[in-house]
Amino acid sequence: MDLSVESEALGLPVRFKEMDSPDITDHPVKSADDLAKLADPRVPDGGRFPVVLETIRTLKAKSDAMAGGYLASPFTLAGQLMSAEEISINTMLDPDLCHAVLDFSCRVTCDFAAAQEDAGADFVVLLEPTAALLSPELYETFVGPYVRRVVERVGIPVVLHVCGQTTKLIPSFVKDPVGGLSLDT
């Protein structure tokens, strides 16, 4: 799965690999002021957004199967902007910075989710691999509220996908009003 569509549209450098998922090669956000330096993602026209949206439209036009798209969750996108390690550490050291970055990334995620819905998606999958780094308490402060904002923004089901060891977080996941859960080990 490609978690770099939103980050690339924000101007972050992406390294594409032949046989693996793309990597974000720089995490430029160190302070809330750095958010203003990011590129305007221009949802739905910037970066590779049009490719994703056209794929959804094509699937809907040529098939009766349900079509859905992937989104980097607000916390995962914030982790790409700051680095997963920095966002995780700063949940304890600088929660105000985390919330500023999360507010910004949530707007991008919500706009992309709405664009996918407008393109005809029957559902979206909110990819949240970074949440497995958090305790349940930190999840409920720094992930859950932003997942809820995405769910509230669209009128289609949102499936929450979380990678890694998630057993400790399952009670938190069920508090999120998502249409489905996809857990990975």
Where do the PLM segments sit?
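Active-site loop segments of alpha/beta catalytic cores
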Residues: 41-185
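A contiguous, low-structure linker/loop signature
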Residues: 2-42, 58-62
